[in-house]
Each structure stands twice: as structure tokens, then as C-alpha cells.
Amino acid sequence: MRRKNLTEVTEFVFLGFSRFHKHHITLFVVFLILYTLTVAGNAIIMTIICIDRHLHTPMYFFLSMLASSKTVYTLFIIPQMLSSFVTQTQPISLAGCTTQTFFFVTLAINNCFLLTVMGYDHYMAICNPLRYRVITSKKVCVQLVCGAFSIGLAMAAVQVTSIFTLPFCHTVVGHFFCDILPVMKLSCINTTINEIINFVVRLFVILVPMGLVFISYVLIISTVLKIASAEGWKKTFATCAFHLTVVIVHYGCASIAYLMPKSENSIEQDLLLSVT
């Protein structure tokens, strides 16, 4: 009988925001507007950087890569979420769920390390301005971007393999897309080893880049404190303010959603953090 149950699970259904069924239309409109603004904003950033030759610098190159990565990242999540408001029981195949998880994890980790690369770029621009152009050559920039993406691919392969080799007995995913932990909960067997593997991966992809960014800003601050002119302070603040804001929001939400014990997080909180 158990074998029969294992072979029957070929697709999943998302629980999504079914708890808020009375507000489906409102949520659909709100998230559609936010999604449109996000995609449009990233498209504008990439277009301006591409057209304006004055912006063909390492800092804006990394920014354009982050914008493109975030755009593709949302394509794997938000349309699925929006469709769940319209068709509440829309299923996804096991293969489709695997594919969605792989690309979601790849791009999420890629974003983490791209932010780290941007922190390194700011460090070099402020702390080593004379050597900045030499060290951050076009070749080095491409290698850093490829390195971030490669780490994302490798970590995604580990996580997806550890999850989708499990036998599944349940079909309702407690999320609006195929995230690692909600899918793992559908397994029929003990997943302790898989949970340990994925927790170690999460620690690596969140704490390591966050730590590197922290070190970069400690070095930046120590350099800025030596600057006597107000103009130098303004230039440094203008360079780092946007990146630091994104870093705080990104790593803050990621840490709460993926590092805190699940007993301390409500389902609604996890859903909203995932959207962020």
C-alpha cells in the first residue's frame, strides 16, 4: 500500500494565500502592480546602463547583472503566485516543480553573491582608488559574475538532489511556489539528513556573503574616517547607500525566512518574506 502511495504523486497543488480567500482580488491587484513595477524598474536600470556609455563601469555592470538576475528570478515565482489567485487549485507536475526549485534556488543564491561582489567593488573603489581600474578589469568583473552564478548552480544542484530524490506521499505544498522546505515536508520518510544538508547550504549562502559584505564595509568605514573633506563623505555615502539598503533588506529577510526555527515563524510571515 505504501508503494502505491509513492508512485501516485506526480504533481503538486499550492496552498498559497488560500487563508486570505476573502481578499484574493485585492492581493492579486497589489502583487500584480508590485510585480509590474519591479520588472519595469529592473528593465529601466538595464536599459539606461546599456545606453549610457558613462555608466559602463564595474559598479554599474554588477548592478545590471543583479537587476537582470532579479528579473528572471521573479519570473519563476510571481506569475505562479498570481495564477493561484485566479485558479486556486492549479497543479504543477513533479518535473515542473523540480525545475522551478532549481532555478529559484540558483538565482536566489546568485543574488546573494552578486551583492557580495558589489560590496567588494565598493571597497576597491573607495579603499584602493588608484588600483581600482587595474584590479576590476572587464575580465575580472565577468569572472566574478560567473563565479557567483556557478556557486548558485552548484548549491542548487545539492539542494534539489537532496529533496527530489525523496519519496512523496502528500501533494499540497504549503506555499505559493516550490520552495525547498515546504516540498520536503511532503516526504513519506524521515528527512533529518536532508534537513541538515539544506541547513548547512543555507548557512553557507547567507552567512558567508553577508560576512564578506560586513568585512568590506568595516574596511570602507575605516577608510572614510580618514577622509577630512565633507565632499569625500558625500561621495562615499552616495556610492554605498543604495547597496547597503539592499543588503540589509535582502539578507535580513533571507535570515528570518531560512535560518530562524520554523516554530517561530507563522506561515503567513514566511509567505510575505518570500515575496520580499
UniProtKB/Swiss-Prot annotation:
Give TM segment ranges.
Answer: 26-46, 55-75, 100-120, 140-160, 197-216, 237-257, 271-276
Instruction: Please list the residue ranges that the record places on the Extracellular side of the membrane.
Output: 1-25, 76-99, 161-196, 258-270
Function summary: Odorant receptor.
Q: Which GO terms describe its biological process?
A: detection of chemical stimulus involved in sensory perception of smell
Which InterPro entries does the record match to this protein? GPCR_Rhodpsn, GPCR_Rhodpsn_7TM, Olfact_rcpt
Q: Name one GO molecular function term.
A: olfactory receptor activity
Topological domains annotated Cytoplasmic: 47-54, 121-139, 217-236
| The name this protein goes by in its record | Putative olfactory receptor 10J6
Membrane topology, as annotated, equals:
Multi-pass membrane protein
> What is stated as this protein's family in its record?
Belongs to the G-protein coupled receptor 1 family.
The record's GO CC annotations read: plasma membrane
